A protein has these predicted regions:
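Metal-dependent phosphoesterase signature
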Residues: 69, 75-101
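Short, acidic loop-to-helix structural element flanking the phosphoryl-transfer center
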Residues: 91-120, 127-128
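Non-catalytic pre-domain segments flanking phosphatase-related domains
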Residues: 2-62, 226-237
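C-terminal cap/substrate-recognition subdomain and adjoining C-terminal extension
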Residues: 29, 126, 130-237
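Sec-exported extracytoplasmic/periplasmic mature domains
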Residues: 47, 51, 74, 110-118, ...
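Active-site-adjacent structural elements in enzyme catalytic domains
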Residues: 53-78
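Solvent-exposed, polar/charged alpha-helical surfaces in well-ordered, non-transmembrane soluble domains
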Residues: 40, 44, 103-110, 131, ...
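Structural motif
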Residues: 59, 118, 182-184
Length: 237
């Protein structure tokens, strides 16, 4: 058994070294500083907006994975076994409930509650993982019964945009039953933020109400150029 565990540990270490983006997220002081900085900026914005608004309902909308919870152990395990992401293994990882908070996340969530706000978790974890996700967030000090969790379903129309709309308007399965103001949106991908024609847009509100955390492990950029205005010249100067 000891030999087996040593072998697995060696495999995970090799996977981390082969996937420098995961090692950077897990081990670098810079990653911790960047995520903490983003959350501190978001907290300052929320507290400024909350002054004099305590009796009016408001919330922050946050993603879960690689925003509040660190899932790099899952990706290291998959890399060690040379396996791609798949839903069964991901659901099994969620069921463990062992993901730790991203640096700065727990303090931000606590600050929101201290300022009189509520937290809305809008995530593409599937609805079938709701209970284990709540348990993980609770263990990490980031869940209360006053929160809302809006997860992915098999209904293609239940997009993150629609979930955010329900939260703001107070209707549907995601809303609190009353309209609320959203003081901040935070996530590790642009899809976690309002679209151009939605609630002030994402770029226009960047650093004011919309906040992006670094995630070099995965995203739409893996499959094509996503940077606005970037011209691809096929190597021709």
């Amino acid at each position: 058994m000891i030999v087996l565990l040593l072998g697995l540990a060696s495999g995970f270490e090799t996977a981390a070294n082969d996937h420098l983006e995961l090692k950077w997220m897990r081990d670098s002081e810079e990653f911790s500083a960047l995520t903490t900085q983003v959350f501190l900026q978001a907290e300052q914005s929320v507290r400024t907006q909350a002054r004099g608004r305590q009796r009016q309902p408001w919330t922050v909308v946050v993603d879960i994975d690689e925003t509040l919870l660190d899932n790099t152990p899952y990706f290291l395990e998959m890399a060690a076994y040379d396996r791609p992401f798949d839903w069964p293994s991901w659901d099994a990882w969620c069921a463990r409930g062992t993901a730790e908070p991203v640096p700065g996340a727990q303090a931000f969530v606590s600050a929101v509650r201290d300022a009189g706000g509520r937290v809305a978790f809008v995530s593409n974890r599937h609805e079938r993982t709701r209970d284990v996700t709540v348990e993980n967030l609770m263990a990490a000090g980031m869940w209360t019964a006053e929160d809302r969790m809006c997860l992915l379903t098999d209904d293609d129309s239940y997009t993150k945009r629609e979930r955010r709309r329900q939260l703001r308007d107070g209707d549907g399965t995601c809303g609190w039953g009353e309209p609320v103001s959203v003081f901040a949106y935070a996530g590790d991908t642009m899809a976690d933020l309002p679209e151009a024609d939605e609630d002030g847009g994402r770029w226009e509100q960047l650093g004011v109400r919309t906040f992006v955390l670094p995630n070099p492990a995965y995203g739409k950029w893996e499959h094509g150029v996503t940077r606005p205005g970037l011209i691809v010249t096929d190597g021709v100067d």
